[in-house]
């Protein structure tokens, strides 16, 4: 299985060359740790360095906002869009019904023959759907009918798991190499807020604020199916050129 480089040198070294082709990787971290920027880097470098078309899907930022953010690092996303190497898509979770965004993502990927897809973020997508919408999205016509007579109870956890399973299944069907982001719980052993993503994806990278310095972020490749990876802690820094990843100093406590 070949490797797909993210394009961030230090992170690709930690991944021993990149992500195994066709894998879906979870980037999980608290707010402000760099999840979105790593995802955008994956898409931008894929298009600009490796000529691999990509689709970036955001629940929090519009295409215009993403283009403006990219300019801070000297990245011209519009030029890549004109060359059919990039598609940006915003999901308005307050307006979406029946998870139709999955069809849109698939259509955009086919339109440019995408090799890379990023969804930012799973957390938002799992927090704005009703139980009945999940049933409908899964094709549960019997439950849909029963639900009009007797409500079908579904806990928030069940809803989240249904959404995640559906999304990851669709991503796998695209044959693209994918990154998905999630909020990382502040405490506990879970690696995502939905508590199920980490078991369904092929790999997990966590981003945590360094406990002794607010400006520093710890990066750790927790798992990578179908390939070896560094087990060492790494540090993230944001420069005017984007994300930099370097090995942490020996002896640093996580």
Give short role names for the model-derived ranges:
Residues 53, 85, 113-116, 174-181:
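Loop/turn-to-beta-strand initiation segments
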Residues 25-28:
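Short hydrophobic/aromatic beta-strand immediately N-terminal to the Walker A/P-loop
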Residues 30-95:
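Conserved P-loop
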Residues 1-8, 112-113, 139, 232-254:
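NTP-binding/hydrolysis catalytic cores, primarily Walker-type P-loop NTPases
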Residues 6-18:
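Pre-Walker A adenine-sensing motif
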Residues 172, 176-241:
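Phosphate-binding/switch region of NTP-binding enzymes
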Residues 91-172:
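Phosphate-binding/switch loop-helix module in NTP-utilizing enzymes
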